[in-house]
């Protein structure tokens, strides 16, 4: 199984690292082309394009400027330990064992606007470039056109390497849109997390994002290899609802805490 998750806007380059092992991103030539385009933007243009404050725009203009093609543990850190958002709160990679990192390196991929596809131990320099941003480039009007089939091809390589044909889609719609399902040599399973609110079950963004991380951790910790094993997921009160599920969609629900 290959698990797909989204990156996070919040980054952590200060906390102690729980592993010293690292690999290098496999699509850096593409990243370098995007950096070339991003460096043309002024902070006000970045602010408008990304819908962020002037302060954040200044920080990200500096990140684009400081980005270097040579990645070292001094100027970068492992992606799975650098991202800090709701998904990564659930994942808690900072508590992984070396064996957990090994399994994750084979079975987990992070989709990225700048790096395309990241393995957990791939070094990553800080950036902010969401997949849905309309950054004009040499290949088109946005990042979806820039990446084209590249991300899908890289995922197919990972699937072939593990002799598998199942993708667990725990990424957001914005990021999964960078994947071409018809060209992906895999069955796609999408876990959906519903929380009860005033007697009704619905997707609540914060909880759903954290649950994607919890599910990723559940797969990694238990070394799961078959999609039917996912139905045993019960972290933080979630349970599998077979009646609401279908072949491609596994529905998990959680009752409101009273």
From Swiss-Prot:
Q: Which GO terms describe its biological process?
A: response to hydroperoxide
Give GO cellular component annotations, separated by semicolons.
cytosol
Q: Which domain of life is it from?
A: Bacteria
> Transmembrane stretches, by residue range?
none
Q: Which InterPro entries match?
A: YaaA
Protein family according to the UniProt entry: Belongs to the UPF0246 family.
Instruction: List the protein's name.
Output: UPF0246 protein YaaA
Q: Name its species.
A: Escherichia coli O157:H7 (strain EC4115 / EHEC)
């Amino acid at each position: 199984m290959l698990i797909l998750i989204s990156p996070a806007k919040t980054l952590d380059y200060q906390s102690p690292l729980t592993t010293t092992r690292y690999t290098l991103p496999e699509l850096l030539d593409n990243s370098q082309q995007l950096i070339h385009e991003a460096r043309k933007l002024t902070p006000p243009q970045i602010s408008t394009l990304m819908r962020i404050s002037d302060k954040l725009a200044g920080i990200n203009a500096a990140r684009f400027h400081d980005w270097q093609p040579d990645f070292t543990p001094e100027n970068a850190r492992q992606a799975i330990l650098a991202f800090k958002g709701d998904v990564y709160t659930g994942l808690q990679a900072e508590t992984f064992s070396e064996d957990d990192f090994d399994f994750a390196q084979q079975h987990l991929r992070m989709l990225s606007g700048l790096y395309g596809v990241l393995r957990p131990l791939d070094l990553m320099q800080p950036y902010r470039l969401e997949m849905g941003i309309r950054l004009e480039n040499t290949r088109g009007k946005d990042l979806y056109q820039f990446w084209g089939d590249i991300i899908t091809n890289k995922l197919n390589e990972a699937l072939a390497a593990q002799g598998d044909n199942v993708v667990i889609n725990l990424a957001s719609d914005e990021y999964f849109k960078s994947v071409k399902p018809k060209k992906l040599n895999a069955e796609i399973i999408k876990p959906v997390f519903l929380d009860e609110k005033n007697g009704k079950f619905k997707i609540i963004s914060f909880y759903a994002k954290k649950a994607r991380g919890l599910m990723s951790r559940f797969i990694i910790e238990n070394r799961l290899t078959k999609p039917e094993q996912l139905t045993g997921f019960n972290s933080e009160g979630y349970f599998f609802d077979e009646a609401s599920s279908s072949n491609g969609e596994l529905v998990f629900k959680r009752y409101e805490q009273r």
